[in-house]
């Protein structure tokens, strides 16, 4: 039986939203065990007694890592926090994967320092799946903040892992890999990006060249590789812009005159389709590529729905033996 360790105390809607998602997923994933780490009393109040069985368990912890906690200090000082105890279960082989909605930096630290890097991987990278305009498939972008500074060889390894993820988990044959840069020409960018371009071009990947920021959501690449600083800034920009556009549309239509409101009714289906395009819940969470088990971060404001999809994502990563394949591939290099 596959086992997912879940930090039940992380995120704005914890633990209620997490428990709801687990109970829903539990009924659809009979070969998967869910271990919830957190305040025993709170969790017991939310979980019906008849649901606690071989497929669902609670591991009592007494501490929680807050968003404002300094990541590395937090995982060292809060040994009995839900996140750290869950990470240690994965490290000790008592669970196969770790999921959290909590402090991103602390989760990255748990992945790197507790669960550990795969031999041969220089630096793990954080990778979400983001929307595109012409498809429901979206695209992967890595790194979005696990590393403040990057080297060309890091970008190559992230591209290799992300390409394999796109094939195994997203079902994309021969994924198109692009390098985020400030121009399409091969000589664009600083020294890191120019050298990364050459490494990607000379690899066995389906490298399609540089991609600029204004092309990211057009669906011209299945995987976009970038340094962590730029990737994090771009991710926040995409999230913020999407939210603002949808809010402005809604506000304009609901607060307009009678003709505007009548027009809104006529295009209701199209607006729902637009909202669906920018709905990232169906993609699951951001994956920390390059550590010894699946470690996945879901947005801290998530409700039941994105958590449910993330549980399905994590389960598939375990089932497809993604990390084992990474280990076989990179330990030989």
Curated annotation (Swiss-Prot):
Its EC number is 2.3.1.274. Pfam families: FA_synthesis. It is found in: Cytoplasm. It is an enzyme of class 2 (transferase). It catalyses: a fatty acyl-[ACP] + phosphate = an acyl phosphate + holo-[ACP]. One of its GO terms (biological process) is phospholipid biosynthetic process. It comes from the Bacteria. GO terms for cellular component: cytoplasm. Gene3D superfamilies: Isopropylmalate Dehydrogenase. Keywords: Cytoplasm, Lipid biosynthesis, Lipid metabolism, Phospholipid biosynthesis, Phospholipid metabolism, Transferase. PANTHER family: FATTY ACID/PHOSPHOLIPID SYNTHESIS PROTEIN PLSX, PHOSPHATE ACYLTRANSFERASE. This is Phosphate acyltransferase. It comes from Lactobacillus acidophilus (strain ATCC 700396 / NCK56 / N2 / NCFM).
């Amino acid at each position: 039986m596959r086992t997912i360790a879940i930090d039940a105390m992380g995120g704005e809607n914890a633990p209620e939203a997490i428990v709801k998602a687990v109970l829903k997923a539990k009924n659809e994933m009979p070969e998967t065990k869910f271990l919830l780490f957190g305040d025993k009393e709170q969790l017991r109040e939310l979980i019906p007694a008849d649901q606690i069985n071989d497929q669902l368990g609670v591991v009592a912890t007494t501490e929680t890592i807050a968003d404002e906690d300094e990541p590395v200090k937090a995982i060292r000082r809060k040994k009995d926090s839900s996140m750290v105890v869950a990470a240690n279960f994965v490290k000790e082989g008592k669970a196969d994967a770790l999921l959290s909605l909590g402090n991103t930096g602390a989760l990255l630290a748990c992945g790197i320092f507790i669960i550990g890097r795969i031999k041969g991987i220089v630096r793990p990278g954080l990778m979400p799946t983001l929307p595109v305009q012409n498809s429901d498939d979206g695209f992967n972008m890595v790194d979005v903040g696990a590393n403040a500074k990057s080297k060309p060889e890091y970008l190559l390894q992230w591209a290799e892992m992300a390409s394999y993820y796109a094939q195994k988990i997203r079902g994309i044959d021969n994924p198109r890999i692009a390098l985020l840069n400030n121009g399409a020409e091969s000589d664009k960018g600083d020294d890191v990006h120019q050298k990364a371009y050459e490494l990607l071009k000379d690899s066995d990947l389906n490298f399609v060249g540089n991609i600029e920021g204004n092309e990211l959501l057009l669906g011209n690449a299945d995987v976009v590789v970038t340094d962590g600083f730029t990737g994090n800034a771009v991710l926040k920009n995409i999230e913020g812009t999407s939210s603002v556009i949808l809010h402005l549309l809604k506000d304009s239509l609901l607060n307009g005159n009678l003709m505007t409101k009548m027009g809104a009714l006529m295009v209701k289906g199209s607006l729902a389709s637009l909202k669906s395009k920018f709905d990232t819940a169906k993609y699951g969470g951001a994956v920390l590529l390059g550590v010894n088990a699946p470690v996945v971060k879901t947005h801290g404001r998530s409700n039941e729905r994105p958590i449910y999809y993330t549980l399905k994502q994590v389960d598939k990563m375990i089932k497809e033996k993604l990390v084992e394949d990474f280990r076989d591939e990179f330990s030989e290099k």
